[in-house]
């Protein structure tokens, strides 16, 4: 083999000419102090607000306070190994989390790392946890229903796709149960759900995951968990991480539902961080920007129009709108909704579902107070048949409550008042629903239709739920075409009503329901 010196020299010349030496400039600083997961660093002159900082031992932190001679940062995870004098490096990147379809069916921590023991998540896509919410022009009005499968909610406080509906109540009133029912009810609808657990016991989160698996809901759900034992910084960023994962689907013309359980604990974690960073405390010792903490998160839940989706997907998806629906949960203390955080979130959201301890203890579950629960935009998104049939439900309950208060003092009641009270009792009874026993549009319409046409007037209150269940089974077996037609069209035709009237007559003649 002959070596050609000219060729070798040409090769070496070409290598030298094509050699690229990219020098990366990264600012370094020194740890001055470490206290409760808060690190003060000197020498990071060009750190950005919210930038990721790298500590020794492959630990990362978040720059939060940019002062004249130092930077205050929170450590995302364990901080025990960080000591005074350690070197800290700027990464030049804002905190990002993995996004994509690969996350569906998995349980991840606040940084998107898997914690379910099912191996790594193979996604190459990441997105920043802090994003600007869609602008006014990019949005579209809410006009599609997000069915929860709960009679009391879908008939009285309907939720639309792209809406923010607050679930508020004391501890142990069934807030999480309502949210989980909404997640389970999305099975087969193509809606991707994200459940963000903030500051909860690890055992409670494991129980939620088990329940979702049992009902086949993990197939369309991502669980983001920041347990009570984790650093306050992780509890603070968990909702933003979950929101970013949901926005991935929204921006591709799909529908997503996100549950924040609960934002009270996130506010407490943020208060802890702020006080340790020596930011001035305000009302209830919360920092001045606690309203902005929740508003910038909840404003990201929206319905975006076709042009925005087309722009975000570079023309790949055309003619589709995307939505991210938020169900934030707030825990009140002794029913005090006038506290700082509850009033903030009530003013940010598009309505609220109030759950009451007294109703819960009386066996009315979901324990929804129909009088003060509202949906400010959901009416436009309600299914036609539910809107038509459910209109009288709220009125019946409101009148019943008013009359029930007066009837305690009156000894003899006239016939009309007595009938109204009996009707109200039956409606209250029929609004009860067991957990994970959600109904589809047609089944719900069937119950509302029976209430409206007086079919329950001769049914004892104690047997109302059993009567409802048996009648549903009867129609499912004898007249499935009626249910299919209502589900397909979202309306009840005159023909369907006639069929149901005949079915009710036939059912009543064969079913022993009288006391």
From Swiss-Prot:
InterPro entries found in the cross-reference section: ATP_synth_asu-like_sf, ATP_synth_asu_C, ATP_synth_asu_C_sf, ATP_synth_F1_a_nt-bd_dom, ATP_synth_F1_asu, ATPase_a/bsu_AS, ATPase_F1/V1/A1_a/bsu_N, ATPase_F1/V1/A1_a/bsu_N_sf
Group of enzyme by EC: translocase
Disulphide-bridged cysteine pairs: none
Site (Required for activity) residue list: 373
Compartment(s) of residence: Cell inner membrane
UniProt protein name: ATP synthase subunit alpha
Keyword terms, alphabetized: ATP synthesis, ATP-binding, Cell inner membrane, Cell membrane, CF(1), Hydrogen ion transport, Ion transport, Membrane, Nucleotide-binding, Translocase, Transport
E.C. number(s) listed in UniProt: 7.1.2.2
Residues that hold ATP according to the record: 169-176
Gene Ontology cellular-component annotations: plasma membrane; proton-transporting ATP synthase complex
Assembly: F-type ATPases have 2 components, CF(1) - the catalytic core - and CF(0) - the membrane proton channel. CF(1) has five subunits: alpha(3), beta(3), gamma(1), delta(1), epsilon(1). CF(0) has three main subunits: a(1), b(2) and c(9-12). The alpha and beta chains form an alternating ring which encloses part of the gamma chain. CF(1) is attached to CF(0) by a central stalk formed by the gamma and epsilon chains, while a peripheral stalk is formed by the delta and b chains.
UniProt topology in membrane: Peripheral membrane protein
Reaction catalysed by this enzyme: ATP + H2O + 4 H(+)(in) = ADP + phosphate + 5 H(+)(out)
Organism in which the protein naturally occurs: Neisseria meningitidis serogroup A / serotype 4A (strain DSM 15465 / Z2491)
UniProt keyword annotation of Nucleotide-binding present: yes
Job description of the protein: Produces ATP from ADP in the presence of a proton gradient across the membrane. The alpha chain is a regulatory subunit.
NCBIfam families: atpA, PRK13343.1
